[in-house]
Amino acid sequence: MQASRLGWSSYGDTQYVAHVLRYYPYGRAFTAGGNQAIVEVALTQVGNQGGQPYWSWYGFDSRVEWCACFVSWCADQCGYIESGLVPKFAGCVDGANWFKSHNQWHDRNYEPKAGDIIFFDWGGDGITDHVGIVEKCENGTVYTVEGNSGDACKQRTYAVGSSSIYGYGIPAY
């Protein structure tokens, strides 16, 4: 065998997989595309405290309200910002307005799909003030992954049509 003549115990790079995967976000290739990819990225971030990777990626030098930075960061990891599927936004109002202006918007009574962007109105004043990513919707319950939920990335649940839901941005995956 050529390998043993050259003094090798095997052919090729024994660390090939690790060396290739370093070029993928989080060291792994996505198992799904489209709307599921952003959910997979978001789920890898559950437990992050303080949001530093997201607001610093966006360009801020110090901590800001970072829920929108988190959503944008997740979208960027999937190539969705570069491809124009999801806007890069640091303010919830800007993100909601982008989806509305592109006719990719549904109100709170819509039954969302995985990968939809969920906007909230905690104050009940008709202005969105928080945003997350829909993980799934089952039996009238919306499951989300949100950044800056108590200053951490967390999974949360809401009833479809909840008064705290402002609406949904629907990326054209």
Give the predicted meaning of each segment.
Residues G7-Y11, W55-E65, W105-N109:
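A glycine-rich, coil/turn loop motif that links secondary-structure elements
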Residues Q2-S10, N48-Q52, Y80-I81, I127:
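Secretory-pathway/luminal and periplasmic proteins that interact with or process carbohydrate-rich
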Residues M1-E40, S162-Y173:
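Non-catalytic cell-wall polysaccharide-engagement segments
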Residues N139-Y173:
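Active-site signature of cysteine proteases
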Residues T14-V17, V64, A68, P112:
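Short alpha-helical patches at coil-to-helix transitions and adjacent helical residues
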Residues M1, V20, V41-V46, S72, ...:
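Short, functionally critical alpha-helical segments immediately adjacent to catalytic or ligand/cofactor-binding
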Residues I81-D151:
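...with weaker cross-activation on analogous glycine-rich loops/strands in unrelated enzymes
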